[in-house]
Amino acid sequence: MRKSKLKKINAVILGSGGYTGSELVNILSKHPYVKIQNFGSERVLTGKGKNINDKLSLIDVVFCCLPDGEAQKFAIKNHKKVTIIDLSGDFRLKNPASYLQYYGKDHKASNLLPEATYGLTELCKNEIKKSKLIANPGCYPTSILLAIIPLISGGLINPRNIIIDAKSGFS
């Protein structure tokens, strides 16, 4: 078997105690090109846990699986030091007024919203490669887009005729 020359990506997962974070730990721990250097909760950021801020120069990417509002705090301090992939809703909306409307609170890092790249890698690979702040789409847009894009691209359905009615038993 031929060995790959690809370098492993050094990753940190913040918020690994929640559903999204624990699933990400499970997935990335089996990935051949990812080495999880640290994972934990927001305590890592406050200094109550093992602090990673001093070691960011050794990290390639930080996955933020934190409650809404917490990734903003991390990004304010670290967006120039490391690539951040936010799995919360903190950087999905470009307009701070929309964030206030949907989340009921002001965005604390609104100056970073224009820098954030939102999108699926299947559709926005080049933009995501260049970005240091990536807003991962949520479960609804991901499931819908992955299902309908091949149908639209193949000319099998007209995008003007699509109606999505999504429900969740867990949120």
Model-derived regions, located:
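N-terminal Rossmann-like NAD(P) cofactor-binding subdomain of oxidoreductases
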Residues: 1-171
